[in-house]
Amino acid sequence: MTILSDVKALGQQIWLDNLSRSLVQSGELAQMLKQGVCGVTSNPAIFQKAFAGDALYADEVAALKQQDLTPKQRYETMAVADVRAACGVCLAEHESTGGKTGFVSLEVSPELSKDAQGTVEEARRLYAAIGCKNAMIKVPATDAGIDALETLVSDGISVNLTLLFSRAQTLKAYAAYARGIAKRLAAGQSVAHIHVVASFFISRVDSALDTTLPDRLKGKIAIALAKAAYQDWEQYFTAPEFAALEAQGANRVQLLWASTGVKNPAYPDTLYVDSLIGAHTVNTVPDATLKAFIDHGTAKATLTEGADEAQAQLAEIAALGIDVETLAARLQEDGLKQFEEAFEKLLAPLV
């Protein structure tokens, strides 16, 4: 038993927020699964780093550049292969839990973030290209992305809805998921295999706010927001409306804590893992945070602790004139821009 097994017993999955060819081919990912990692997430920044720093791509890049393909098609050829390989490594985990764990995420192009139909078309194409039941397509949680979520769920595709900072936007996502499930059920189709995670970003909130807050609130607001979002989640998914869908096989959306590597060196390096452990959630962690948590983290159900204190902290920043929904919109736009820039850097060597 490892600390990751202890976390899993508390109802939370730990995923790895990283993917590269070396990680898969070296057996390192398989070893991480033996330790208790339950899935993998990727994004344009992760692939940009992998392509630049992993020598295993060099021959394929050279070969693909001899073919009549666009840079994006060359990228997708390699990314789809990596995700398919990672899905293979995670398949035993996926099957051992009846399809509830062992997912690997691949993100649609950041340029589609405001294009619902384009997102749907690309998500369908990528999902078909990967060809694995434990593939999850990652879609940004813009209004267009949430519209796409409804359609993709009704198609039977599992989705990782990413770049959530807003509780209100997260609730909109739950409603879109429920509509997609209802459509599929109305068509007489199975829903039990569909899983959606709502990726709620953590550390970027504190990074944005800490310079403006009194010391007593520094490093506290991201966790307070996450705890409040979890209360919202409990209310939504225990309500009679969703219970009716659940009775027909629907799974609950799971909150996934993302951006859980600590950015401020003054904070404990496992802060955003230790503080957010709770049932029906996922935490996707970068390699350094995973190693730190295995070394000196604490497996304890903390997510439901201090709920009143979290609400009080949120009320206090509201009294200071900070509107968390306005902040959330700005952070999402910043995140989209970062992924667009990473995507451009990723494609540049593939021209």
Swiss-Prot record:
GO terms for molecular function: transaldolase activity. GO terms for biological process: carbohydrate metabolic process; pentose-phosphate shunt. It is found in: Cytoplasm. The gene is tal. HAMAP family: Transaldolase_2. This is Transaldolase. It comes from Neisseria meningitidis serogroup A / serotype 4A (strain DSM 15465 / Z2491). Belongs to the transaldolase family. Type 2 subfamily. GO terms for cellular component: cytoplasm. The keyword RNA-binding does not apply. The active site is at 138 (schiff-base intermediate with substrate). InterPro entries: Aldolase_TIM, TAL/FSA, Transaldolase_2, Transaldolase_AS. It catalyses: D-sedoheptulose 7-phosphate + D-glyceraldehyde 3-phosphate = D-erythrose 4-phosphate + beta-D-fructose 6-phosphate. Its EC number is 2.2.1.2. Pathway: Carbohydrate degradation; pentose phosphate pathway; D-glyceraldehyde 3-phosphate and beta-D-fructose 6-phosphate from D-ribose 5-phosphate and D-xylulose 5-phosphate (non-oxidative stage): step 2/3. Keywords: Cytoplasm, Pentose shunt, Schiff base, Transferase. CDD domains: Transaldolase_like. SUPFAM superfamilies: Aldolase. PANTHER family: TRANSALDOLASE. Transaldolase is important for the balance of metabolites in the pentose-phosphate pathway. Pfam families: TAL_FSA.
